[in-house]
Amino acid sequence: VPRTSWRAAALAGATAVAAGSGAGGASWLTYTYLMRQATEARGVIGRTWAKPPEADGVYLPGAQSPVPWRRDVPFDLHLMIFGDSTAAGLGCASAAEVPGVLLARALADESRRRVRLSTKAIAGATSRGLAGQVDAMYVAGPPPDAAVILVGANDVTAKQSLHRSAQRLGSAVHRLRAGGAVVVVGTCPDLGVVGAIPQPLRTVVRTWGRQLARAQAAATRAAGGHPVPLADLLTPEFLSAPDRLFSADGFHPSAAGYELAARHLLPVLAAALGHWAGGPVPEPPLTSAAARLWLPRTRRGPRERLFPGPAVGTVAGEIR
């Protein structure tokens, strides 16, 4: 996340809080305080220039590694990943941990078909960049059978217009749907689970993130896509086990965090393609009581592998 993004979030947050207070002195104090917190958050989280592992290829049922993609390599389904660094898998140590790979492998096993994975996601991207990613797709070839979009966190920290961000996402979904692709969108995650962001800045970005997620879900549905509310589904787990679910930078998910997200994305993706045999896919929550709660007092459970058993449980222990 660029330094200017944190400064933009702090500045906008100070403006909003000060407007509510109606006091000039409070405005300056709030601005100074939140700007200092933005600098602190950027210093703790740091900058990463690492590239996510490259994971594209054709995944066969039961195979651990892909067949490198060439024009003469056959496949049955084409899965394409769009969005930001979480879509690209920043924080993963190996290609096998990347969310696109988790989904491609699981979809190949579920459908018993050969799944080609192509990644257009770019670290640091906001919803503004989705149009360019879709353009790049059309330059490379025809639309895929399925697309997964993960985007939103950078829109929040850069304090882009939530309405415009949702519109841009909806436009990307519409273009992909017009090309015949099934589209699944993981909406903006809950930035309130990032402990490196100090209070009250954390509350500011958390509130914006949840507002953006709701707008993204509405725009996705209107364009014919399938939204998956990651904030509502993942917040309890990330609050209960941050050391396990965050990567070393404290901001991006770890392999276990991406695995947890893939558990929630796969049933929606496979069902939309007509290849889900795991029973009825429940309607995703519009809101979650657990996601509104703040600091957990929990026990940590063991890491589970992807999809062989029941989904990772909800928060263990008491939440204060």
Sequence positions of predicted segments:
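Short helix-capping segments at alpha-helix termini
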Residues: 108-113, 177, 222-224
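Catalytic His-Asp segment of secreted/periplasmic serine-dependent ester chemistry enzymes
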Residues: 192-320
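A short helix->loop->beta-strand "cap" motif at the edges of active sites that frequently abuts
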Residues: 179-181
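Alpha/beta-hydrolase-fold catalytic nucleophile elbow
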Residues: 150, 186-187
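Residue-level recognition of beta-strand->loop/alpha-helix junctions
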Residues: 119-121, 187, 229-232
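Conserved SGNH/GDSL esterase-like catalytic core that processes O-acyl groups on lipids
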Residues: 78-80, 88-167, 308-317
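Alpha-helical scaffolding segments of alpha/beta enzyme cores, especially the outer helices
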Residues: 167, 171-175, 211-218
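N-terminal secretory targeting modules
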Residues: 1-78, 274-320
